[in-house]
Swiss-Prot record:
Record GO terms (molecular function): 2 iron, 2 sulfur cluster binding; 4 iron, 4 sulfur cluster binding; iron ion binding
Function: Required for insertion of 4Fe-4S clusters for at least IspG.
Top-level taxon of the source organism: Bacteria
Subunit relationships: Homodimer.
One term under GO cellular component: cytosol
PROSITE patterns per the UniProt record, alphabetical: HESB
Binding site for iron-sulfur cluster: C41, C105, C107
Protein name, as recorded: Iron-sulfur cluster insertion protein ErpA
Family named by the database record: Belongs to the HesB/IscA family.
Keywords noted in UniProt: Iron, Iron-sulfur, Metal-binding
Cofactor binding note: Binds 1 iron-sulfur cluster per subunit.
Species of provenance: Actinobacillus pleuropneumoniae serotype 5b (strain L20)
Length: 113
């Protein structure tokens, strides 16, 4: 049996929330896609969307029978990170804990490398 290192963690809390959000949809192929774009106050920002397509080179991580998809360009900035879901006084949201970010903005949605 080989020991394959997964480059990104998809937490149980995030998987549970994705599962609850897609249960009402009429598309069992939906997955959460996390991606990085230029912008935000720190240079890069995280984006989340639901997608039923897996493109060539995409990484798919399964947890609780739901998938997280990351394109190769975004993955290089996310290696070693964690995609989580939090609920608190400031609201609920998907968050990325990224060890590659040298700084993040106050809201946590943008970062710099």
């Amino acid at each position: 049996m080989s020991n394959i290192q997964i480059p990104l963690i998809f937490t149980d809390a995030a998987a549970k929330k994705v599962k609850s959000l897609i249960e009402g949809e009429d598309n069992p192929n939906l997955r959460l896609r996390v991606y990085i774009t230029g912008g935000g106050c720190s240079g890069f920002q995280y984006g989340f969307t639901f997608d039923d397509q897996i493109n060539e080179g995409d990484l798919t991580i399964e947890n609780q029978n739901v998938g997280l998809v990351v394109d190769p360009m975004s993955l290089q900035y996310l290696i070693g990170g964690t995609v989580d879901y939090t609920e608190g006084l400031d609201g609920s949201r998907f968050v990325v804990q990224n060890p590659n970010a040298s700084s993040t903005c106050g809201c946590g949605s943008s970062f710099s490398i």
